[in-house]
Amino acid sequence: MKINALLSAGLLVLGWMLGLGSAPCDAKERDPRPREESVVQLALLLDTSNSMDGLISQAKSQLWRVVNEFHGARQHGRQCVVEVALYEYGNNSLSAGTNYVRQILPLTRDLDAVSEALFKLTTNGGEEYCGAVIREALDKLSWDKDANTYKAVFIAGNEPFRQGPIE
């Protein structure tokens, strides 16, 4: 139940990202030629603080289920190519100077690498700065500028979004 609420919060972040946070696609930036592939870009943000001890396995499974849903998606009659980035946050083994945020993988099409990295994550400690990890994903990933590319951020954590220096 708690994880479903967390993923629902991730969908709220998605709306924010698509409306405000993604790189703007000005008409002059768009390529008028049709793309040969339909692309889906996902950023997975996972709270690895100690407060996630009892939830971490379920959170990983839910995030991976999201990836699998998009992996089977079609757009304009074509199978979508899925690119996934992975972040962890809230882990005391991460630097306070990075707001306890670490990019594990940039956007990649290697879903085996994403799965391996995701399921290796463990919990430790806890300063869960949701705003910082969201900002990092929005600002630092190489998001496709094509307006037809579906871009989404999914965050799984159990703390309020207002913690930390970035709200």
Positions of predicted regions on the chain:
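Positively charged n-region of N-terminal signal peptides that target proteins for export
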Residues: 1-6
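Bacterial N-terminal signal peptides
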Residues: 8-20
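Divalent cation-coordinating acidic motifs and surrounding scaffolds
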Residues: 23-167
